[in-house]
């Protein structure tokens, strides 16, 4: 595996919000739209994605601060993709790894922990894939979010996925799961916000949840020892910014973590292929990129969000592929599982 060592400023979107809006030819008046005027503009100016009149609730609490756009790091950037990998026109790992139970949608609740939740989800998938579906474990986003501080970021305020992958190498991460999951070391500590169909209602949420404390022990009543329950990685890197490199990485090793700029129009996404069209920059978000495809001659990435399975397309969304829309292809973080630690 070849890498290029770079000392660089990693960013979640290659340009500022205003610069990207200008670069895409988005009129100034469209950049400033919110609410019903924005919804009306989106419905008449594009046909790639359907729009919700009601915006995503707790939107500001689900995304990261703008300060997580930049970080100075010495990064291992994976060089050219494997030339022997044959890239299919579409790919969905759920169809290939049908026995992997880790391919489900998480719920980060009112906490900007997307960087930890998406990384834990990608690691869980990669463990299943690396073991040929013999090992099924949900990695704890809580362990990453609460204990990888300050090097990874600041818990519910946001963080950097590449640092979470590095934490997986050097500290290891225990088993986890969704809120109140039994028989795991450290399940997610924050309950889902509001009503979600027939799911258990735990209550509403107000503001951004405080980051829970780091506890280097398993929850009471679980017959697991924290240190023994750890799983480890053996490599962490940024994937080269090219469509083929990203596709090759996903095919070979499993889902990756993508970070992108979130604009006001994403708040109203309902279904279809998202492309930034209007609205101001609101923050940044990290998600699990699992595959790709094409619909009506539009290439897209297939992405798992962490806003419950009643958001978007059953918890997933698609975004245009090949144009680095919102910086989605610019900072792809990934890593290799140490199978001996499983």
From Swiss-Prot:
Protein name from the UniProt record: Cathepsin B-like cysteine proteinase 2
Residues of the signal peptide: 1-18
UniProt entry keywords in alphabetical sequence: Disulfide bond, Glycoprotein, Hydrolase, Protease, Signal, Thiol protease, Zymogen
Any one Gene Ontology molecular-function term assigned to this protein's record: cysteine-type peptidase activity
Active-site residue list: 114, 285, 305
EC number: 3.4.22.-
Entry-linked Gene3D superfamilies: Cysteine proteinases
UniProt organism field: Haemonchus contortus (Barber pole worm)
Broad EC category: hydrolase
Function according to Swiss-Prot or TrEMBL: Expression of the protease correlates with blood-feeding and suggests a role for the protease in blood digestion.
Name of the gene encoding the protein in the UniProt record: AC-2
């Amino acid at each position: 595996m070849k890498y290029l060592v770079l000392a660089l400023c990693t960013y979640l979107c290659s340009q500022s919000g205003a610069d990207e809006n200008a670069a895409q030819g988005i009129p100034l008046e469209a950049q400033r739209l919110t609410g019903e005027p924005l919804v009306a503009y989106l419905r008449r100016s594009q046909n790639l994605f359907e729009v919700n009149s009601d915006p995503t609730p707790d939107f500001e609490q689900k995304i990261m601060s703008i300060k997580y756009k930049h970080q100075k790091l010495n990064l291992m950037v994976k060089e050219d993709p494997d030339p022997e990998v044959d890239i299919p026109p579409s790919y969905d790992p759920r169809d290939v790894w049908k026995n992997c139970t880790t391919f489900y949608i998480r719920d980060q609740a009112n906490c900007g922990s997307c960087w930890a939740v998406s990384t834990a989800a990608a690691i869980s998938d990669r463990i299943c894939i690396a073991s040929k579906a013999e090992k099924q474990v949900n990695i704890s986003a809580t362990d990453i979010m609460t204990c990888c501080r300050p090097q990874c970021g600041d818990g519910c305020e946001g963080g950097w996925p590449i640092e979470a992958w590095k934490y997986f190498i050097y500290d290891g991460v225990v088993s986890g799961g969704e809120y109140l999951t039994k028989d795991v070391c450290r399940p997610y500590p924050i309950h889902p916000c509001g009503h979600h169909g027939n799911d258990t209602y735990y209550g509403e949420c107000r503001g951004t949840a405080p980051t829970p404390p780091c506890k280097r022990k398993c929850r009471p009543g679980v017959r697991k020892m924290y240190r023994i329950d750890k799983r480890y990685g053996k490599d962490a890197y940024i994937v080269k910014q090219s469509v083929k490199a990203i596709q090759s990485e996903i095919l070979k090793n499993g889902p990756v973590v993508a970070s992108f700029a979130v604009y006001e129009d994403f708040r109203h996404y309902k279904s279809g292929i998202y492309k930034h069209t209007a609205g101001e920059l609101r923050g940044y978000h990290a998600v699990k990129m699992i595959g790709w495809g094409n619909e009506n001659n539009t290439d897209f990435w297939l992405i798992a969000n962490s806003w419950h399975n009643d958001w978007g397309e059953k918890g997933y969304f698609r975004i245009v592929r090949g144009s680095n829309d919102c910086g989605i292809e610019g900072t792809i973080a990934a890593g290799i599982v140490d199978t001996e630690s499983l």
